Curated annotation (Swiss-Prot):
Protein name from the UniProt record: Acyl-coenzyme A amino acid N-acyltransferase 2
Protein role: Acyltransferase which efficiently conjugates very long-chain and long-chain fatty acids to taurine. Shows no conjugation activity in the presence of glycine.
Active site as annotated: S235 (charge relay system), D329 (charge relay system), H363 (charge relay system)
Intervals of motif Microbody targeting signal: 418-420
The organism of origin for this protein: Mus musculus (Mouse)
Keyword Membrane appears in the UniProt entry: no
Length: 420
């Protein structure tokens, strides 16, 4: 009987699970299944797990527990979320979402194959294509007034619920989440705010009027549903997202993933308002065993020293807010930040906020099955940064939160009677 490695679907969106089976092997055989992927800069990411075949000589990742390797137990998508860079501090992040998928090569070996130095030929292989964009999604490059970004539109006439997508101090234009949300029926503007085209190379302040201009641009687009938009935001972007929720009437549903609820590092300006930042206590930086920096403890003590000039007035938000926090976030104590905002809402008699806290999850809560990124190079610092996250807990948080994010936007952005 021929040895086969079967992965279905072999061509799908990155947030769709893949079923992996090996057949045609001897019973009770120890095997290795290895996943390998290269990013657009040819950096290699790999994962592997060791399994024992059943009496029929088969391994089914939905039923068979991994005995060892990068994870242990029954984890059908473990090979995907446990992918690690061969060179330290690389982060797997798709830049060109429209023209090519991530191509993951799965290899099956009929022994424990963990030594890089020993070349064993694989018994079977399978390629899996993972797309960040679904069929029919269109991308428009945006240069409107000061606004710079990319707008992803689902197929069809619309109008579609509109969302602005913001990342943190990584800078540039990050498109993979926007294109994926557009594949699920939302019109999403991936918005750059520094280190892109003619935008400032480094942020000196947060000019909220820039983000208001982006919100107005989105709402004026013929394919965007009225009367308001959503925001999905991570890290420093989530601080800006929360500020948009507080001050911009156009924003009616905001997702803040692991961000501060105070103004940090740079001042925030909006019309006549200037909010002064709190600065992290750099003497409280810790160095992880990997050599990466932990910033979690640099802002914890500051909560006692805050004044009204630093704290975002969440009670002013007209719309709904969903805080998503990883309790193992090593960049900041995001749960403490979100809890302070929730307490403030309660004190003002507001029930517009909700917090989803994930024990064991780190800072970079991405779409499902994304490789869990514990540490990565951080360009703004010129240093590696520790993001935190226990592999299994973080992977589970990515899967659960992605469903919750879509439910939240469908509930609060959709006009009655819309089908999505």
């Amino acid at each position: 009987m021929m040895i086969q490695l079967i992965a279905t679907p072999s061509n799908a969106l990155v947030d769709e699970p893949v079923s992996i089976r090996a057949t045609g092997l001897p019973p009770s055989q120890i095997v290795t299944i290895k996943a390998t992927v290269k990013d657009e800069n040819d950096n290699v990411f790999q994962s592997q797990a060791f399994y024992k075949t059943n009496e029929a000589g088969e391994v089914d990742l939905e039923k068979t527990p991994a005995l060892g390797g990068d994870y242990v137990g029954v984890h059908p998508m473990g090979l995907f979320f446990s992918l690690k860079p061969k060179k330290a501090f690389h982060r797997l992040m798709k830049k060109d979402v429209m023209n090519s998928p991530l191509c993951i090569c799965l290899d099956l070996y009929d022994s424990v194959n963990w030594l890089e130095t020993v070349r064993i030929p694989s018994k079977a292989s399978q390629r899996v294509q993972r797309w960040f964009v679904g069929p029919g999604v269109k991308r428009e490059q945006i240069q409107e007034g000061r606004v710079r970004g990319a707008l992803f539109l689902p197929p069809g006439k619309g109008p579609f619920p509109g969302i602005i997508d913001l990342f943190g101090l990584i800078g540039g234009l990050v498109e993979f989440r926007a294109s994926l949300l557009a594949s699920h029926g939302f019109a999403v503007l991936a918005l750059a705010y520094f280190a892109y085209e003619d935008l400032p190379e480094k942020p000196q302040e947060v000019d909220l009027e820039y983000f208001e201009e982006a919100a107005n641009f989105l709402l004026s687009h013929p394919k965007i549903q009225q009367p308001g938009i959503g925001v999905i935001s991570t890290s420093k972007g989530a601080e800006i997202g929360l500020a948009m929720a507080c001050y911009l009437k156009q924003v009616i549903a905001t997702v803040c993933i692991n961000g501060p609820t105070t103004i940090t590092i740079f001042p925030l300006r909006y019309q006549d308002l200037v909010m002064t930042p709190i600065h992290p206590a750099l003497e409280r930086i810790q160095v992880h065993d990997s050599g990466a920096l932990l910033f979690r403890y640099t802002t914890q003590y500051l909560h006692n020293k805050l004044n009204s000039q630093n704290i975002l007035p969440v009670e002013k938000a007209q719309g709904k807010i969903l805080f998503i926090v990883g309790e193992n976030d090593e960049c900041l104590d995001s749960k403490l930040h979100a809890q302070k905002a929730m307490d403030r809402l309660q004190r003002h008699g507001r029930s517009s906020g909700r917090m989803l806290a994930y024990p064991g999850a780190g800072h970079l809560i991405e779409p499902p099955y994304s490789p869990v990124c514990f540490v990565a190079w951080f360009p703004v610092l010129g240093q590696p940064m520790c993001f935190g996250g226990d592999l299994m807990a973080h992977a589970a948080a990515q899967e659960h939160s992605w469903r919750e994010i879509q439910k939240f936007f469908r509930k609060h952005l959709l006009q009655s009677g819309s089908k999505l």
